[in-house]
Amino acid sequence: MAIKMDKNFTLEILNLLKNNVLKNRLKIGKELTEMLIDEIDKLIETANEISEEISKNSPNNSSLYDLRLIYNKLSTLYEDIDKLLGEIECILSLSNKDIKNWKLWKNLGDKAYLWKAYYEALFCYNKALELNQNTELLCKKGYALLKLYKRDLAIKYFEKASEKDRNNYKALFGLGKSYYLMSDNKNSIKYFEKVLELNPNDVEALEYLGELYYEEDCEKAINYFKKALELKPDDIDLILKVAFTYFKLKKYKHALKYFEKALKLNPNVFELEQIYESMGRIYIYLGEDEKAIECFEKLKEINLYHYEIYEIIALTYEEVGNIEKAKEFYKKLV
């Protein structure tokens, strides 16, 4: 559905959507109804705030961009709810025997999840959970909630699953991921370490732990990244994480080794920029100016904003105390 960018029309659609959800609340279920109403209310509030800002000031690119985001979210939500209500009508027309089969609801939820219809998946998992409160369903609901950014609620269901089975891998991983997304590093580390107790070779958990330790303890971070890399030796993302962690630790020769390894794996343009910029800076730190300039020349072939590169070079020379060289490149910015 294409929503035209008009405040009154938008609010009218949002209120119609809200009324439609409330009218079908018995079919949708209390929890899912509250979630949908909360999403609609947030959009109404934000749309009003942005429209008020635009009416007071001349529209700028930022406010118009924010408004476009609201319309995009509204279009997506409208389609999701419309599809959900349509699917509910079809699903509830099933035979009485099928409606009482939790596995059927689980399968319908899995299918919806696969198609990224997360509200529909939640509806089906809710129906399945009414019939069977097993750990698999609790975790499936938790992951569907994560997809909808309902992290607090997701934690509630992962915890329920964990209470039933303290060593449930999916529940522990879900808790680790939920806390990671909430920037609660302490709890995220706690649960990902529990995941590793169950499976020391879980690459995702190792990578998450590397990222969680990166800011506070690079030595621990590098250990986790390298363990993950042993299991996925050609993963360029992991190779670069190892390289950048060594760079942060000022272990420049180790960092170069991994940046060079990444270059052999056909990195994309964004990765190439990161690699050549980092290698150029490292060679300056090591006093190997010729190699540094070679890297920055390659960077110039990728990044057309050469003044940014000159500024990076100048700042790096300034960092190592070579003021004359820094001045040379600052002049190129003029």
Curated annotation (Swiss-Prot):
TPR repeat ranges, renumbered to this chain: 102-135, 137-168, 169-202, 204-235, 236-269, 273-306, 308-333
Q: One short Pfam family name for this protein?
A: TPR_1
Q: Which UniProt keywords apply?
A: Repeat, TPR repeat
Say yes or no: keyword Phosphoprotein present: no
Among PROSITE patterns, the record links this protein to: TPR (PS50005), TPR_REGION (PS50293)
Q: Which SMART domains match?
A: TPR (SM00028)
Keyword Repeat among record annotations: yes
Domain of life assignment: Archaea
PANTHER family cross-referenced by the UniProt entry: CELL DIVISION CYCLE 16,23,27, CELL DIVISION CYCLE PROTEIN 27 HOMOLOG
Name the record gives this protein = TPR repeat-containing protein MJ0798
The opening ranks of the lineage are: Archaea, Methanobacteriati, Methanobacteriota, Methanomada group, Methanococci
